[in-house]
From Swiss-Prot:
Keyword Phosphoprotein: yes
Annotated PROSITE patterns: RESPONSE_REGULATORY
Name of the molecule in the record: Response regulator SSK1
Lineage of the organism: Eukaryota, Fungi, Dikarya, Ascomycota, Pezizomycotina
Pfam family, one: Response_reg
Stated role: Two-domain response regulator protein in the two-component signal transduction system of the HOG1 pathway. Involved in multi-stress responses and is essential for conidiation, secondary metabolism, autophagy and endocyrosis. In addition, regulates mycelial growth, cell nucleus development, septum formation, and organelle development. Also regulates trap formation and thus plays a crucial role in pathogenicity.
Natural source organism: Arthrobotrys oligospora (strain ATCC 24927 / CBS 115.81 / DSM 1491) (Nematode-trapping fungus)
Gene ablation phenotype (knockout): Results in defective growth, deformed and swollen hyphal cells, an increased hyphal septum, and a shrunken nucleus. Decreases the number of autophagosomes and lipid droplets in the hyphal cells, whereas their volumes considerably increases. Causes a 95% reduction in conidial yield and remarkable defects in tolerance to osmotic and oxidative stress. Also significantly decreases the transcript levels of sporulation-related genes. Leads in a remarkable increase in trap formation and predation efficiency.
Residues modified as 4-aspartylphosphate: 903
Annotated compartments: Cytoplasm
Length: 1077
């Protein structure tokens, strides 16, 4: 099953389902046959394409003497490979072990030699990469694992611990060198010297030959960037031919490489590096493999060195190649590449902790590049993808101090340090970029090889794929240069913030970075980095660094503080002061209206200034908006500003339009032309003087226009008549006093002196105004109404002139307190009533009675209609009903209605449309307020729009909207179409009574003549018969008729111009008072 999955993963790139199935089927059959054949063999490591002529020997396996006929000879069980993955076509060697070795033992090496001129047709088909991991154990590889304990299996080799770090140096353009691989014999190792394993994977793809000295030659190392990723197996790149090498040359090259490792190479290139780069690979203890590679030579740059040593599996890998500007450790892709291509892959990522169980073949799925999909973020995957990037960064060992790193990656494999240096020389770049400058970052020195670090060139596209290297030893620490584009960085020991330094202090930040680059420190040490030290001392908030508190106050107020920055102007401080004084200043002034005043200290602030006597003489002044406040405060207050030195926030002087009140005293008071009622205040300094306020009296002999200042009447009900221009409450339910409107009182020529009655006479003068809804007449008729006054105050008459003339007061007999004087639009002259009739009390509005009006109720709900009818019966007024809007318009055309209760939601025609129709007919026929400006000639009116002039249409009808909605929009809509008021259902009877009384009084004032004629008709004998009609519709009640007869004998007699022009003039005529029933 595992083979099937591997084959399926390998052939994912095949296009088409048919070809994919055929390819899978054939591959599966081949793999199954090969697996069954391998299970019968003793060694299941590698199946050579052609068996070498020289059979396995005790100490050496030789080929055909350099003939190159076979690629690998059949190996004994002792030297067999761990296993082979049939899902891949490459062959690999793995040398894992859990044992440690002593470097002082003798070398017992065995050589595998071969000729560089390998036969292309006899090479192995592909490559197999064996990784360490958690793959399950294969059946064919089980036997080899059992031989590890007794020493018969593959044994790991040690590094040459006496070698020094190796430096890279330029080499000739094309070089063929041979590096030797030396490993000691399997003697008793030191358990404490190493602590982890290093699996080394050798990918062999060329045909190798073993010479008689046991030297393996013919391994060609090519850059991964130059190896084509062949989608088709037929694409086979041509190999570069290798010249044959003699045994003596191989032995000399091996000795030179060993001596290069032993000689100190610190700061100077080694002998071996003059011809090329070499790395040593550790194989089993009885074998030494010499790898040859030929690559074009390019100028190289020497890199620092890192001491890396393996524990149970140690290897010194010497790769013969020309040094490149960058070094990349790449892995051979899992695809089938050229038969002549070879690659060296080292897996350093998914390494488990040391244990005795050997590694197994990797069966994880791979992507198109041959990398495992589940280890995409590993160091090997990232190095494989970044093959054109920087090489391994290495450092010199520093002070022998062991510090355990606080942060370690689970994927990191540990290696113990030794004096041996491992230098990787990677493939060439097609277009090698220029080496970029790196910014060193202090990294934790660890005892393990955490990640692979890359220095030198840097590509932004590979920013997230770089890794950093941290190596450690028990007694040695090494510094690692980490690339600035490292994907994984060590977190800082302090909490990271968005900004630690103010943007204006970029120079400080640049200085800290330069210091950090000059002398990098290690995170985890006591000192830490410069940036960390400075960041700990700096404030975490920008406001704490650049702000300042300033004292401000209002004139005579308490000081307070506002927070400003060091570069704020005075104009900015005005905004802050306006927010500080939101209620006192923010509601009446804008920010530019404020003025900031500064008061300098009275004495020098410092002792030096007092001694020298050179204190600057500052004076109080207003600050300009463009001045920097903090600089001014430093100049005025060198020792700092205190609350006593608070800046004063001033506002411009407000010009008061009120005229000064006259001086007190018993003299005449006058007012200027154009002075409003608001300026004429009583001595109580308010628009409404309390009732108990004592007002000084004025002699009655003063001439000119004077103001009534007699004592307030004791009766509170006449308070509204006392104030000249205060309108009465809008309804009985709203009796709260309101501020009078700006009504101007026109002044004319001076009026003559008023005459006074005899001392101790009856009442004082009262000025009357029409009720709300009426038009202010040109002349105001003043009458005397007796009111209780103080005996010490003589009675006086007050006249407000509007035109030249004199109005003489006429004394009258005391009338009932409930009787109010009548107001008519034409000028009238008061005459004394006949003495033969007695004054009787009449029914007025103050007695709680509703004027006699006719109400039209428009309601489609029968329940609401019956309730409104019951209300009208209790109010003793006439009414009529309608069930829809069209019927309401028809009944209104008959005339005689003073009030309409109109429901909004009505069938056929809703209340709003009915209201519009009524208002249109009133406008066309010139009724009410439209009588002065008719819309057009009367003959242009249609017959349907003409109203009967004989009917009573003297005033516009009052329409009140009734609805169950309390929304403001519905109310506005009703008032917009012509309704006078708005009521919400359900209607309270008490509230409705007050409203009907208010509307009746308004209608009596609007249509006084029509209402008087109706009174005359109702007063005729037999009009009502002393009984009410059925339902109260169309006729006045008996009580209303009796009230009308009593009103005919009213005490107030008015001679009207209209009545005087009648054919039978009457000296007196009884006129009912507005609002009287």
């Amino acid at each position: 099953m595992l083979l099937w999955k591997a084959a399926a993963t390998k052939l994912r790139g095949v296009k088409g389902m048919r070809g994919f199935r055929d390819k899978i089927k054939g591959t599966k059959t081949k793999l199954l046959r090969r697996d069954s054949k391998d299970s019968t063999e003793e060694a299941s490591a590698v199946r050579p394409s052609k068996t070498a002529k020289g059979g396995p020997g005790t100490g050496t396996e030789t080929g055909s003497g350099g003939s190159g006929e076979g690629s690998w000879g059949r190996k004994s069980k002792r030297h067999s490979l761990i296993g082979r993955d049939p899902s891949r076509s490459d062959q690999s060697l793995v040398a894992p072990s859990d044992r440690t070795f002593d470097t002082t033992t003798d070398l017992d090496t065995t050589s595998i030699s071969g000729n560089g001129n390998a036969n292309p047709t006899a090479s192995a088909n592909g490559d197999i990469v064996i990784e360490g991991g958690t793959a399950p154990k294969r059946r064919s590889a089980g036997k080899e694992f059992d031989n590890l304990e007794d020493g018969t299996g593959l044994q790991p080799q040690l590094l040459n611990t006496t070698a020094k770090p190796l430096e890279l140096s330029p080499a000739p353009p094309l070089t063929d060198t041979t590096g030797s691989i030396e490993s000691p014999s399997t003697a008793a190792p030191d358990k404490g010297s190493f602590n982890c394993e290093l699996p080394v994977v050798l990918s062999q793809k060329d045909s190798l030959k073993l010479n008689k000295n046991g030297i393996l030659v013919g391994v060609e190392s090519r850059p991964p960037s130059q190896i084509p990723l062949a989608e088709n197996e037929n694409l086979q790149p041509q190999p570069q031919p290798q010249p044959p090498q003699s045994n003596a040359a191989a032995t000399a090259a091996s000795a030179a490489s060993v001596s290069a490792l032993i000689q100190p190479s610190e700061g100077t290139p080694s002998k071996a590096s003059t011809t090329g780069q070499s790395s040593t690979l550790s194989l089993p203890s009885d074998k030494t493999v010499i790898l040859e590679s030929t690559t074009p030579a390019v100028p190289s740059t020497s890199t620092p060195s890192t001491n890396i040593a393996a524990t149970t599996t140690t290897a010194a890998i010497t790769t013969t190649s020309v040094p490149a500007p960058t070094t990349t450790i790449s892995r051979t892709p899992s695809r089938k590449l050229s038969d002549r291509s070879s690659d060296l892959s080292i897996n350093t990522t998914n390494l488990p902790p040391p244990f005795t169980r050997p590694y197994r073949l990797s069966q994880f799925p791979t992507d198109s590049s041959g990398l495992r999909a589940d280890t995409d973020s590993s160091a090997l995957s990232q190095l494989q993808r970044s093959s054109s990037r920087a090489s391994l960064g290495i450092h010199e060992p520093i002070a022998p101090e062991t510090v355990e790193p606080p942060f370690r990656d689970k994927r990191e494999s540990s290696f113990s340090h030794g004096p041996e240096t491992l230098v990787y020389t990677g493939p060439l770049l097609h277009n090698p970029p220029e080496p970029a400058s790196v910014v060193p970052v202090a990294a934790e020195v660890a005892q393990t090889l955490h990640t692979v670090s890359e220095t030198g060139t840097f590509q932004p596209t590979e920013l997230a794929r770089n890794e950093s290297v941290v190596s450690r030893n028990e007694s040695v620490k090494s510094r690692i240069l980490s690339s600035s584009g490292s994907r994984r960085k060590h977190p800082l020991s302090f909490s990271r913030r968005q900004s630690l330094i103010h943007p204006s202090d970029t120079g400080l930040l640049r200085y800290l970075l330069e210091q950090e680059s000059a002398s990098p420190t290690t995170y985890g040490r006591e000192g830490g980095s410069n940036i960390q030290s400075v960041a700990g001392l700096m404030p975490h908030s920008e406001n704490q660094l650049r702000t300042r508190k300033v004292w401000v106050k209002r004139p005579g107020g308490s000081p307070t503080q506002v927070i400003v920055t060091e570069d704020d102007f005075v104009d900015t401080v005005r905004d802050l002061c306006l927010r500080k004084y939101t209620n006192a200043l923010g509601r009446h002034y804008d920010s530019p209206d404020l003025m900031i005043r500064i008061s300098p200290p009275l004495k020098p602030q410092s002792a030096r200034a007092r001694q020298m006597g050179n204190m600057q003489t500052h004076t109080d002044r207003l600050l300009n908006p463009d001045e920097v406040l903090c600089q001014l405060l430093d100049d005025y207050y060198p020792n700092g500003q205190t609350s006593e030195d608070a800046l004063i926030v001033e506002v411009p002087q407000q010009q008061r339009s009120r005229t000064p009140r006259p001086s007190p005293g018993p003299h005449s008071m006058s007012y200027a032309y154009g002075q409003t009622v608001h300026d004429l205040q009583l001595p109580g300094e308010d628009y409404f003087t309390p009732v108990g306020t004592i007002v000084p009296s004025i002699p009655h002999s003063q001439s000119g226009t004077v103001r009534s200042t007699h004592n307030l009447p004791a009766n509170p009900s006449s308070l509204s008549n006392y104030i000249a221009n205060s309108p009465p409450p809008s309804s009985p339910g709203h009796r709260s006093l309101k501020r009078p409107g700006p009504v101007r009182m026109t002044t004319g020529s001076p009026v003559g002196s008023t005459t006074s009655s005899a001392p101790g006479g009856g009442g004082g003068g009262v000025m009357l105004i029409p009720r709300a809804g009426g038009v202010v007449p040109d002349r105001i008729r003043a009458t005397n109404v007796e009111a209780p006054t103080s005996p010490s105050v003589p009675p006086q008459m007050v006249a407000l002139p509007s035109s030249p003339g004199i109005i003489k007061p006429i004394p009258q007999k005391p009338a009932s307190p409930g009787v109010l004087p009548a107001v008519t639009s034409p000028p009238a002259i008061t005459r004394p009533p006949p003495k033969s009739k007695e004054i009787t009390a009449s029914i007025g509005t103050l007695d709680g009675q509703v004027p006699s009006i006719n109400v039209l109720i428009v309601e489609d709900n029968i329940i609401n209609l019956r309730l409104l009818e019951a209300f009208m019966k209790r109010l003793k007024v006439r009414w009529a009903t309608a069930m829809n809007g069209r019927e309401a318009v028809t009944k209104w055309r008959t005339g005689g209605f003073q009030l309409v209760l109109m429901d909004i939601q009505l069938p056929i025609m809703n209340g709003l449309d009915a209201t519009k129709e009524i208002r249109r007919l009133e406008r066309l026929n010139g009724i009410g307020s439209f009588s002065s400006s008719p819309s057009g000639p009367e003959d242009e009116l249609s017959s349907a729009d003409k109203l009967d002039k004989s009917l009573v249409f003297k005033g516009s009808v009052i329409i009140v909207a009734l609805t169950a909605s309390s929304l403001r929009s519905d109310r506005d809509e009703a008032l917009a179409v012509g309704c006078n008021d708005f009521l919400t259902k359900p209607v309270n009877f008490t509230f409705l009574e007050r409203k009907v009384m208010e509307w009746g009084c308004m209608q009596a004032l609007i249509d006084f003549e029509g209402w008087r004629k109706w009174k005359d008709l109702a007063s005729k004998p037999g009009a009502s018969g002393g009984k009410t009609s059925k339902g109260g519709r169309g006729k006045a009640s008996a009580s209303t008729s009796a009230a009308a007869k009593k009103g005919k004998e009213s005490s107030i007699s008015v001679l009207d111009n209209a009545s005087s022009s009648s054919s039978t003039p009457q000296p007196t005529q009884s006129v009912p008072i507005a609002g009287q029933s």
